[in-house]
A protein has these predicted regions:
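Extracytoplasmic ligand-binding clamshell segments of periplasmic binding protein
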Residues: 198, 223-300, 348, 432
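Hinge/lid segment of periplasmic solute-binding proteins
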Residues: 111-164, 215-216, 311-319
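Extracytoplasmic/periplasmic solute-binding protein
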Residues: 155-159, 164, 188-242
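Mature extracytoplasmic/periplasmic domains
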Residues: 267, 289-308, 332, 336-410
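A structural signal for short loop-to-beta-strand junctions that line the ligand-binding cleft
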Residues: 105-106, 134-171, 201, 322-323, ...
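Extracytoplasmic "Venus flytrap"/periplasmic binding protein-like
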Residues: 70-140, 176-182, 273-276, 282-283, ...
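Conserved C-terminal helix/tail region of periplasmic/extracytoplasmic solute-binding proteins
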Residues: 174, 396-449
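Short, solvent-exposed loop/beta-turn-alpha elements that line the ligand-binding surface or hinge
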Residues: 129-140, 222-242, 249, 299-314, ...
Length: 449
């Protein structure tokens, strides 16, 4: 559910960072040897000053205040400082700070696609089986648990999830006599028909692989699989190629957005232009929070001009991307994981903070604020309107990127952006798949590409 995504400088730099972490992590990642945390004669943990890093602005102030107040009330004499880190700088900051016991944050939020690299590098303290069960166990979102695990040992837990679905101009679709599609092919036909010189039927940047891989997943394809001890890029798999070719057709037929574009504020495309006339797009694909940037202009309680969150459902509406044969297509799941630094000098206090984060009260607050809770037992809280219902529905059908140790290097080098741009520009998908398989496979296994 990130609003911006990790873009590191190069693959080599990301791999170097992971190697540095590996070198600094011991075989026993449960706690650093020089941990200063002590217990009193009564067995209670001595007070300490804990630092939590949150990524971006998705955790509302209300939730941050709750964490600070509750932690300090339950851990007398201890303090909690919450520091917000920009998504774009997060990997670099984690890599320089996590190995340093003097400067490491104690508990960190990181993206679900970043978690495998850091867990494989030994950056995090193990979540014991007993603590795992206490914090939710198998009710925790399992795809995110897998992203934070190595060989069955859990190091990073789900924090929150978000999903993506289709936002569309219901008035424009209705005027064109087009119904909400029930298959992926019908979707492609519909948005191609809606396209004009001034309006995308479906606004999609050519480099936007995070939306584009939904076509791969819907066709039964994978980005990579683990064969024995090695990860292998599977772009050349026939199902993956089918998905990429279908995405290519949709991009070429429906989008006016340049092939060079990636992180596009698609939500703006649905809104009426200030000067009047048709919007820039009839359809977009975006995370659920995009709703609050879409709609007619109104004033909030402070007198500020804001969007009304799609209040007019005859004008703005949503639907899940349909699958090849109907149902709901698997989409890429956004969201975050939460972990304790292996070098934290306050491991027990850190675990106490986790107990608050995974408490019924905090999970309820996440759901009430539109953030998919880590504990799936609280999903029903979100299902009070169509937005919550579709978030849960699409999340239940979502998929993650491969949990390979080198995945952050692939993302950091913008390899998929490059591949999807070439596909958007009309490149031969089969040839490009073979070429990029050779590039990506060694990177997935922590080797320079």
């Amino acid at each position: 559910m990130k609003r911006t995504r990790l873009v590191a400088a190069t693959a080599a730099s990301t791999i170097t960072l992971a190697m540095a972490l590996t070198a600094c992590a011991s075989d026993d990642t449960e706690a650093p040897a020089d941990s200063e945390e002590t217990t009193s004669e009564s067995g209670e943990v001595e007070p300490g000053d804990l630092t939590l890093w949150v990524a971006g602005g998705d955790t509302p102030d209300e939730l941050r205040e709750y964490l600070v107040d509750t932690f300090e009330a339950e851990n007398e004499g201890s303090t909690l400082t919450i520091e917000e880190q920009d998504w774009g700088d997060l990997v670099t900051k984690l890599t320089t700070s996590l190995p340093d016991a003097e400067n490491t944050p104690d508990v960190v939020e990181l993206g679900n696609t970043q978690a495998p690299t850091f867990t494989n590098a030994g950056a995090f303290r193990e979540i014991s089986p007993e603590l795992y069960e206490e914090l939710g166990g198998d009710n925790l979102l399992q795809s995110f648990v897998e992203a934070g695990s190595v060989d069955g040992t859990v190091y990073a837990l789900p924090y929150y999830f978000g999903s993506r679905y289709m936002f569309y101009r219901a008035d424009i679709w209705s005027d064109a006599g087009i119904e909400v599609p029930t298959t992926l092919a019908e979707f492609g036909d519909a948005v191609t028909e809606l396209r004009t010189d001034d309006m995308s039927g479906f606004a999609l940047g050519g480099q936007d692989w995070r939306n584009g891989i939904s076509w791969v997943f819907a066709n039964g394809g994978e980005l990579a699989v683990k064969e024995g001890e090695e990860w292998v890029s599977t772009l050349s798999d026939e199902n993956t190629i089918a998905g990429l070719e279908q995405w290519q057709d949709v991009y070429e037929g429906a989008s006016n957005v340049p092939a060079t574009e990636r992180d596009v504020a698609y939500w703006d495309f649905l809104n009426d232009k200030a000067e009047g006339g048709a919007p820039d797009a009839a359809t977009i694909m975006a995370p659920g929070w995009a709703r609050w940037s879409i709609g007619d202009l109104t004033e909030n309680d402070e007198g500020e001009e804001v969007r009304d969150g799609m209040a007019d459902d005859s004008k703005f509406d949503i639907f899940a991307l349909p699958g090849v044969d109907g149902g709901v297509a698997p989409v890429f799941a956004g969201g975050s994981n939460m972990a304790v630094s292996a070098q934290s000098q306050h491991p027990e206090l850190s675990e106490n903070l986790l107990r608050i984060i995974y408490s019924d009260e905090y999970q309820t607050m996440l759901a009430e604020n539109g953030l998919g809770p880590a504990n799936t037992e609280f999903n029903s809280i979100m299902e009070t309107d169509k937005f919550g219902e579709i978030t849960v529905e699409t999340a239940e059908n979502s998929k993650l990127t491969p949990a390979a140790p080198g995945w952050a290097a692939v993302e950091g080098a913008s390899v998929y952006e490059e591949l999807f741009q070439k596909i958007a520009e009309g490149g031969d998908v089969t040839e490009l798949a073979a070429e990029y398989d050779e590039t990506i496979t060694p990177m997935l296994n922590g080797q320079a590409g």
